Amino acid sequence: EPFITINPTWNTEEECAQWVEYCNGDANTEYGRIRIERGYKDPYNVKYWSLGNEFGYGHMEGDNTAAGYGKKGRSYGTKMLEASPDLILCSSGPYPNKEWAEQSARQLVDIAPMVSLHSYVAQPFFMEKEQYKEDYYECIDKVDTQCRKLVHQMREELGDDRLRISFDEWNVWYAWYRAKSVNDGIFTASMLHMLIEEAGPSGIDMACHFEAVNEGAIRVEWDHSFLTPSGKM
């Protein structure tokens, strides 16, 4: 399934609704006709849309307060749903975070039933030979000590069972100077098992390995490409 993130800081509500109409509208809509004129007769039927990305963190532009984002998320989400009522919207935020759960996620549950969670674990560099074993186990253990722990904390803070978790960014942290290893593959396999185990009890409805190309599953060189250990999982 495609999953598109809008930018409520740079784009207007109308522009975001127009993107929805371009993707999902038929010949009776203005932007659906534009898509058809460009050679794509059938709608893309993009169901999943995120109301921005990582709001609440210092590196993101826009209103990074829980109440401010909640207000903006409602105005944008409402406009997008007018263009395509069957969308499943996902709200953003620095989760787990009790304030954001109360002032943003719960306030948006009627239009955005999914809430985004991101987590990356630090990959050891395997610089010291005597530390290899400890570094290896520490990275694998992060599935439970970091990622599963975040899921449980977020589930508790969200409270409302109508709110579902979208674990839409997870990976071993990428560094161009560190080659992928079997460690990445075992972490990925362990993470997939954790997501399956927690899907029901913790309400995880969606998960996305990010980023797929050159930071995770697929490595692209100038003359060839191949699956990394993560990609082979």
Which ranges hold each PLM region?
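Aromatic-lined carbohydrate-binding surfaces of glycoside hydrolases
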Residues: 1, 5-23, 96
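A generic secondary-structure signal for well-formed alpha-helical elements
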Residues: 2, 19-30, 53, 76, ...
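Hydrophobic faces of well-ordered beta-strands that scaffold small-molecule active sites
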Residues: 2-6, 47-51, 89-91, 113-117, ...
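Acidic, His- and aromatic-enriched active-site or binding-groove loops in soluble protein domains
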Residues: 22-43, 70-71, 113-122, 187-194, ...
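Active-site groove signature of glycoside hydrolases
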Residues: 29-65, 118-121, 161-172, 211
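Structural recognition of alpha->loop->beta junctions
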Residues: 45-49, 107-114, 195-204
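Noncatalytic carbohydrate-binding groove/subsite architecture in carbohydrate-active enzymes
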Residues: 65-192
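Aromatic/acidic polysaccharide-binding cleft in carbohydrate-active enzymes
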Residues: 163-233
